[in-house]
Amino acid sequence: IDKLQMVFDKGLYDPANEPDIAYPYLFSYFKGEEWRTQKTVRQLIDKYYTARPDGIPGNEDCGTMSSWVIFSMMGLYPDCPGNPSYTLTTPVFSKVTLHLDSKYYPDGDITITTDRTSGEQLYIDRMTLGGKPLNAYRISHADLVKGRNLDMKLKK
């Protein structure tokens, strides 16, 4: 944890060096350190991404950088290629609806909601998936599709 945190504290993280882009999500692989993912992802979004023509760091590389920020802003990120799962973080939005193709996903859309009342609510306090408590910060694609509704209660 200390070595990973050092990457951010010493300014060694470079989002334009694409192998680095999963780094903030690695904290969540360690129980009790998930808050670091939530804090760091938000800091990186605020620091490196803007709504200007040059608002994406580095080379877009066929959507890599914009995909990182879109997934991160929605609150989930596929941090391990080839593994159909996501690491969860605090969404920027109060509600996100993912419209799925009914040919492949007949149960309908996925909705991610938060109880955000303030921009200071950076941390996930508790979560439910399909109305049932979710105690992990990683979720399989199959479980997300099956649960359909991911709700996050946030805290400062």
Task: Place the predicted regions along the sequence by residue.
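Active-site core of glycosidic bond-cleaving carbohydrate-active enzymes
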Residues: 1-111, 142, 148-149
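C-terminal beta-sandwich/jelly-roll accessory domains of carbohydrate-active enzymes
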Residues: 116-156
